[in-house]
């Protein structure tokens, strides 16, 4: 896969592409796409016996404060193959902090052209509360057994905050490419 040829999305930040690194309900393995080669690498095995509560990946051509592309959790009912590009509507952002600093994860739903199941979801609060609690629980505890690692959930932000995170990520990547 040549990530350089995959656009940010049809109408960013409201409609973005997400390259899936980890499918919904995946085994406890953290995968990451190498941005240069496009190859999928095993980043690490999670020490906790937990499964990902959503399809998980990143928006191409973005750069977040942690030096990686903007992370995205895509809720759904169907696991998506690793390396797939999924058209996504951002509906919120989960603010977190870990041993490396502040970390933001966009919450999205599949675009209605892919799957109309979430057409009524425009903001994170439109999802069932149990869905949000499952996501929070996973990210609050998935590093629990890893030496020196920790996570603190800071709270949720709305879709406009998610759009802002994506816009900042696009601008940061553009500035980084100029250097």
UniProtKB/Swiss-Prot annotation:
Subcellular localization: Cytoplasm
User: Mind listing the GO molecular function terms for this protein?
Assistant: inorganic diphosphate phosphatase activity; magnesium ion binding
Give me the residues that bind substrate, please. Answer: 30, 44, 56, 142
Alphabetical list of InterPro entries matching this protein: Pyrophosphatase (IPR008162), Pyrophosphatase_sf (IPR036649)
Q: Which reaction does it catalyse?
A: diphosphate + H2O = 2 phosphate + H(+)
Q: What is its EC number?
A: 3.6.1.1
Q: Which cofactor does it need?
A: Mg(2+)
Claim: Lipid biosynthesis is one of the keywords in the record:
no
This protein's GO CC annotations: cytoplasm
Main localization, broad class: cytoplasm
Using the UniProt record, name the top-level EC class of this enzyme in a single word.
hydrolase
Q: What Gene Ontology biological process does one annotation of this record name?
A: phosphate-containing compound metabolic process
UniProt keyword annotations, A-Z: Cytoplasm, Hydrolase, Magnesium, Metal-binding
Presence of the UniProt keyword Oxidoreductase in the record: no
Q: Where does Mg(2+) 1 bind?
A: 66, 71, 103
**What family does the database annotate?**
Belongs to the PPase family.
Q: What does this protein do?
A: Catalyzes the hydrolysis of inorganic pyrophosphate (PPi) forming two phosphate ions.
Quaternary state and interactors: Homohexamer.
What protein name is recorded for this chain? Inorganic pyrophosphatase
Q: Which organism is it from?
A: Rhodospirillum rubrum (strain ATCC 11170 / ATH 1.1.1 / DSM 467 / LMG 4362 / NCIMB 8255 / S1)
**Lineage, broadest ranks:** Bacteria, Pseudomonadati, Pseudomonadota, Alphaproteobacteria, Rhodospirillales
Gene encoding this polypeptide?
ppa
């Amino acid at each position: 896969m040549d990530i350089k040829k995959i656009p940010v999305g049809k109408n960013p930040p409201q409609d973005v592409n997400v390259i899936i690194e980890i499918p919904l309900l995946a085994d406890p393995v953290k995968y990451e796409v190498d941005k240069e080669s496009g190859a999928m690498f095993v980043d690490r095995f999670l020490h906790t016996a937990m499964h990902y509560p959503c399809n998980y990946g990143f928006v191409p051509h973005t750069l977040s404060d942690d030096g990686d592309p903007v992370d995205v959790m895509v809720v759904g009912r169907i696991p998506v193959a690793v390396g797939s590009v999924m058209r996504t509507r951002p509906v919120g952002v989960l603010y977190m902090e870990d041993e490396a600093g502040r970390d933001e994860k966009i919450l999205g739903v599949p675009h209605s052209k892919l799957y109309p199941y979430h057409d009524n979801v425009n903001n994170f609060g439109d999802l069932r509360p149990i869905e949000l609690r499952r996501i929070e629980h996973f990210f609050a505890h998935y590093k629990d057994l890893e030496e020196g690692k920790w996570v603190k959930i800071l709270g949720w932000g709305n879709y406009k905050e998610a759009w802002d995170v994506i816009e900042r990520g696009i601008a940061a990547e553009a500035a980084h490419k100029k250097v």
